[in-house]
C-alpha cells in the first residue's frame, strides 16, 4: 500500500469549510483541537444536559474555546459533519438530529466504519461519506500534534457525489498532522473488519484470556498470586514495548536465549492451528454481520452480558492482586 505524507496532500480545500465535530470525548477533543490549531473552523455538537445535569463534555468544549451547539444546530452549520460519538448511540442521533440537516454538497465523516459498513446508518446519495481513522488513542494523537509530529492514520471514501471527498478526507488528516507520520488509503470494510477482528482475537479478547488463563494455571499449581501476576500480566508491557519499538525479531534479540528458545519451542503448542481456525470463524462472524447484529441486540437489551462480564472480571483474583502490585510502582 502507498503511504501518503505532507508533500502528497493539499489541505487548502478546508479553508472555506466548517467542520462540525459531533461529540467531545477522547477522539472528539483531540481531533477538534488539532483541526482548530491548524486554522480550520470547527464547531462542536454536543448534548447540553445529561441526566438533569450539565454535560461535562459541553462545558469542557466551551472552556477549550469552541463554539458549542446542540447536535442538530452543529450539523446544520457544518460542511463536514464528523461523527465521533460511540458506535452504539450514533444511529439514533444520526436519524433524529443529523440526517434532517444534510443536503447535497455536505460530507459525513467517521473515524470507524461500523455503522456505515453494517448499514446502521444509510446516508443520502447526494452526501459525501468519508472516514479518517487515527491509529492511536486521542491522548497520544494530541500529544504528537503538540510535539510537532503526528500519528499514522487511515482514509476511506464510501460516497463521492461532490467529486472532492478524497481531497477533503486527506486534507483533514494533514491538518491534524497525521500525514507527518503517514496515511494509508483503505475501504470502510477493510478498516471495520480488521479493527473488530483485532480487538476480539488479539488486542483485547485474545490478550486478556491469555493473561487470565496463564495467571490461573500458576495460581492453581500453587504459585504465589503476586508472582503469577508479575509473570503473566505486569511484564506483558515490557514485551509489547519491545515489539512496538523494533518488531518481533528485535524483541527476540533482546530477551534471553532461554526465553527465545521457549518462545519458538512452546508458543506454537499453546496458540496452534486450532486457535487459528477459531480466529477464522471469528473473522467470518465479523464479515457476515453476525457479530454486529449480536452487539446491537445486546445494546438494545441494556448490555446485560457486558455488565455481568465487567462485574465478574472485577471480582477475579487477577484484578485484586493486580491492584496491590500496581501500588508498588506508585510514587510516594
UniProtKB/Swiss-Prot annotation:
Matching Pfam families: KARI_C, KARI_N
Keyword ATP-binding listed: no
Signal sequence annotation: none
Cofactor dependency: Mg(2+)
Keyword list, A-Z: Amino-acid biosynthesis, Branched-chain amino acid biosynthesis, Magnesium, Metal-binding, NAD, Oxidoreductase
Residues annotated to bind substrate: 256
Cofactor binding summary note: Binds 2 magnesium ions per subunit.
Residues bound to Mg(2+) 2: 195, 231, 235
Binding site for Mg(2+) 1: 195, 199
Domain KARI C-terminal knotted: 187-332
Catalyzed chemical reaction(s): (2R)-2,3-dihydroxy-3-methylbutanoate + NAD(+) = (2S)-2-acetolactate + NADH + H(+)
Every KARI N-terminal Rossmann domain range: 1-186
This enzyme's EC code(s): 1.1.1.382
Domain of life of the native organism: Archaea
GO MF terms, alphabetically ordered: ketol-acid reductoisomerase activity; magnesium ion binding; NADP binding
Biological processes annotated in GO: isoleucine biosynthetic process; L-valine biosynthetic process
Known pathway: Amino-acid biosynthesis; L-isoleucine biosynthesis; L-isoleucine from 2-oxobutanoate: step 2/4; Amino-acid biosynthesis; L-valine biosynthesis; L-valine from pyruvate: step 2/4
Binding residue positions for NAD(+): 24-27, 46, 55, 57, 87-90, 138
Active-site feature positions: 112
Protein family according to the UniProt entry: Belongs to the ketol-acid reductoisomerase family.
Subunit structure, interactors included: Homodimer.
Known function: Involved in the biosynthesis of branched-chain amino acids (BCAA). Catalyzes an alkyl-migration followed by a ketol-acid reduction of (S)-2-acetolactate (S2AL) to yield (R)-2,3-dihydroxy-isovalerate. In the isomerase reaction, S2AL is rearranged via a Mg-dependent methyl migration to produce 3-hydroxy-3-methyl-2-ketobutyrate (HMKB). In the reductase reaction, this 2-ketoacid undergoes a metal-dependent reduction by NADH to yield (R)-2,3-dihydroxy-isovalerate.
HAMAP family: IlvC (MF_00435)
Name of this chain's protein: Ketol-acid reductoisomerase (NAD(+))
